C-alpha cells in the first residue's frame, strides 16, 4: 500500500504543490498549470481509506463516518507539512493536499512592501484584511504579519485556524496561542467574551468565509483589538463591494466598517507568455476621506483614491502592471484591459 509520505515524495520529484487522490483513479499532482500522474496504479477505495486513516485522529474519523468533510494538517517531512481536505465523491473517500513549508516566511521573505508594513505595524486596533484568490499566499502573508507583531512588541496574539499550519518561533516578549475552529472553538456566542477576558492584543480570525467570523472580527476590532483576517476577492475593489453587501449592507453596518477597517492588501501571481511568473499587489489604507466613501458606499471613489497615488501606502494594480511593463516583465498587450 502506498503511504502519504510516498505520494509526497513522488510529487516532489515533479515539483508539485497539490496532490489529488480519488478512489479508483491514479493519484496526480499539480505543478503550476501542469498535472502529472504519479505512477500507473489506481488506488481503490480501501487503499484510500487506509491512507487517510493513518493520519486522522478519532474525532476526525467520526466526522468522516458521519459523512462530513475534514480539513487537517499532516507533517510530511522535516521542512514540510500538507494541508489535507478529505471529502466524499460517488460514495467513496477522496482527498486533496497542498504542500506548505513548515517554517513561516517573514515579511522580508515575501517582499511585503515596506511602506505598507510601516502603516500596518503601527496599528494597535482595527481590522486588516489580507486578500487574494485561492493559492495566492493569503495565509502565508497573515502569519508573516503575526510574526512581525510578535517581534516588534510585547503582545498576546490568538490565532483561530481551520487547521494548525507551520510553527511559530519562540518570542522573547510575546505569546501566540493557536486554537482550531470546530475543536477548540465551537460556540461563537461565547467566543467573543472569552477572548476579551483573555488579555488579548491581536486576533487572527483566519479566513473570513462566513458571517460568524466577520461579525467576530468587526465586534472585537471595535472593542480595541487589532484583528487580522484573510478574505477571497479578485481585487481590493471586489473585496470592498462584497464586504459592504453583508448583513444587508445598511448604513449602520457601513458606518461600523468605515470606523474599524485599517486596510486591505491584495496580492496575485501572474504569468507572461514566456511562462515567467511574477507576484504583484495593490493596497488600500483607510484614511479619513475614504471612511466617508465607505459610509456612502462609493467604492469607485476609493478606487480613484488608490489610482491617484496621493498616499505612499495606497496603490492599485494598474501601477503594479505598469511597473512590470517598464521592467520588461510584460508587454502592454499582456496587461488586462481593466488595468491599462
Task: Give the positions of each predicted feature.
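Short, flexible helix-loop junctions that flank or precede catalytic/ligand sites
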Residues: 2-340
Amino acid at each position: 500500500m502506498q503511504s502519504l509520505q510516498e505520494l509526497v515524495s513522488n510529487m516532489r520529484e515533479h515539483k508539485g504543490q497539490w496532490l489529488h487522490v480519488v478512489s479508483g483513479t491514479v493519484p496526480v499532482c499539480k505543478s503550476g498549470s501542469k498535472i502529472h500522474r504519479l505512477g500507473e496504479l489506481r488506488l481503490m477505495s480501501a487503499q484510500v481509506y487506509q491512507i487517510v486513516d493513518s493520519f486522522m485522529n478519532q474525532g476526525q474519523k467520526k466526522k468522516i463516518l458521519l459523512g462530513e468533510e475534514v480539513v487537517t494538517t499532516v507533517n510530511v517531512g522535516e521542512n514540510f507539512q500538507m494541508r489535507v481536505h478529505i471529502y466524499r465523491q460517488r460514495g467513496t473517500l477522496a482527498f486533496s493536499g497542498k504542500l506548505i513549508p513548515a517554517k513561516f516566511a517573514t515579511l522580508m521573505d515575501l517582499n511585503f512592501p515596506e511602506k505598507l508594513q510601516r502603516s500596518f505595524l503601527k496599528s494597535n486596533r482595527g481590522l486588516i484584511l489580507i486578500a487574494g484568490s485561492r493559492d495566492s499566499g493569503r495565509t502565508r502573508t497573515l502569519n508573516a504579519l503575526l510574526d512581525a507583531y510578535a517581534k516588534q512588541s510585547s503582545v498576546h496574539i490568538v490565532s483561530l485556524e481551520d487547521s494548525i499550519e507551520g510553527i511559530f518561533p519562540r518570542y522573547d516578549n510575546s505569546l501566540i496561542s493557536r486554537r482550531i475552529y470546530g475543536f477548540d472553538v465551537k460556540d461563537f456566542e461565547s467566543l467573543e467574551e472569552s477572548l476579551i477576558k483573555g488579555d488579548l492584543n491581536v486576533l487572527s480570525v483566519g479566513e473570513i468565509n462566513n458571517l460568524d467570523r466577520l461579525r467576530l472580527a468587526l465586534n472585537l476590532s471595535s472593542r480595541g483589538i487589532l484583528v487580522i483576517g484573510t478574505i477571497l476577492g479578485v481585487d481590493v475593489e471586489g473585496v470592498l463591494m462584497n464586504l459592504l453587501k453583508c448583513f444587508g449592507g445598511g448604513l449602520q453596518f457601513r458606518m461600523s466598517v468605515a470606523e474599524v477597517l485599517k486596510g486591505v492588501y491584495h496580492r496575485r501571481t501572474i504569468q507572461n507568455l514566456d511562462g515567467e511568473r511574477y507576484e504583484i499587489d495593490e493596497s488600500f489604507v483607510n484614511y479619513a476621506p475614504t471612511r466617508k466613501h465607505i459610509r456612502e458606499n462609493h467604492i469607485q471613489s476609493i478606487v480613484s483614491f488608490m489610482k491617484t497615488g496621493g498616499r505612499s501606502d495606497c496603490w492599485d494594480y494598474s501601477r503594479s502592471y505598469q511597473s512590470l511593463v517598464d521592467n520588461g516583465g510584460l508587454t502592454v498587450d499582456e496587461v488586462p484591459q481593466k488595468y491599462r
